């Protein structure tokens, strides 16, 4: 790390995702106003104030440079996975002995007996709480790491009527991380048992996303969401910890984002995918619950002057939402906009590196449009549109192809769990509704199961990826 822990946690400091190239790395290290953290051989996380000559938008900074925000995926009872039958087969040796389960989520209730062995000692090897004040350690540059011995001391204090948080001061306020840890690794208590009841646990409690990012993506005030940068660093920590302990590692991340190309090209997908190349390491992520939430649209954009009309209905006004339109392959697209009252913004030229703002006087709404002609990571054009205080009613986006052939495209809007208004596509497409990072080629992507009907949940997001692969891919 170059810099300090305060640089990382400061709410006025911006976080950036940077490609780890020798020239860029050297330039950043020589800048006293920048803190950097290495994620892996391909990616860095940088922390600094916004340069005076830059605006905070993807045209000035680059699409992948701005961290995307990830929300909690819905949870439901999965008793019907029949974990008891799985763990009771002695020849399978499938109770998780000698394996680390790494959980990236909202934390864990370490006081729960579900995470203790039969002797009453914790099976939690470590907790990295990113929200707490820094204490020096071997692994990370911010937050606090509690090791197994400290957790056992806190458990003993708790059993003796003392305050355990005087010893280990981390909690799971939402309970989401604890629930997921229980599904995966709870020991048998009464009639409940996790899938790997003897596995060791390492948990990362993510810090909340900074306000400037929540404002930029129009996130609902009460929504729980996290930065892509913190998740990338959490994955690196789990890899380093398991490597030092010389133990196999299974990472589970119960989070998802509605934005991204669905090609496996996002920085987080790339980081998680590269981890699976290590021996004895696999990564499990949720497919999401977007199939019937009407957050995806696809179609063919006709050659100018023809176009493909895309309709978004706003039923409840709020801060806003984000719309991304991804062209397939090397096609180039442009858009025009029609407001609910009929005000028209003519076709907006696809200018490289330009961010344009349009105001709608009758609606008291504003739309920001950014074009990235060749998005560096995924290799596709993305049109990034931010709808600020969109008026209720039907917004029409006309999509044009600037090449000689009709151009296929996908469009996604902000996850409903994070959106501050109620918006959806009128003619939505339930396919390719995977959340990011589920499109990673080597990630194990898990769909939702309805335990009441013993079948797939109708809400469960669907594939394929935009490269027409399954996840994990047989490639």
Residues of each region from the PLM?
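Catalytic cores of secreted or luminal carbohydrate-active enzymes
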Residues: 268, 272-296
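Extracellular S/T/G-rich loop segment that most often corresponds to the catalytic His/Ser-adjacent loop
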Residues: 128-129, 133, 139-151, 278, ...
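Subtilisin-like serine protease catalytic core
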Residues: 89-227, 319, 330-331, 439-442, ...
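Autoinhibitory propeptides
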Residues: 9-100, 107-123, 393-394, 433, ...
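Conserved small/polar residues in nucleotide/adenosyl-binding loops
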Residues: 1-11, 469-474
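Short acidic/polar inter-strand loop motif in beta-rich domains
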Residues: 401-410
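Noncatalytic modules at the cell exterior or secretory-pathway interfaces
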Residues: 389-401
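Short acidic, glycine-rich surface-loop motifs adjacent to enzyme active sites
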Residues: 235-262, 286
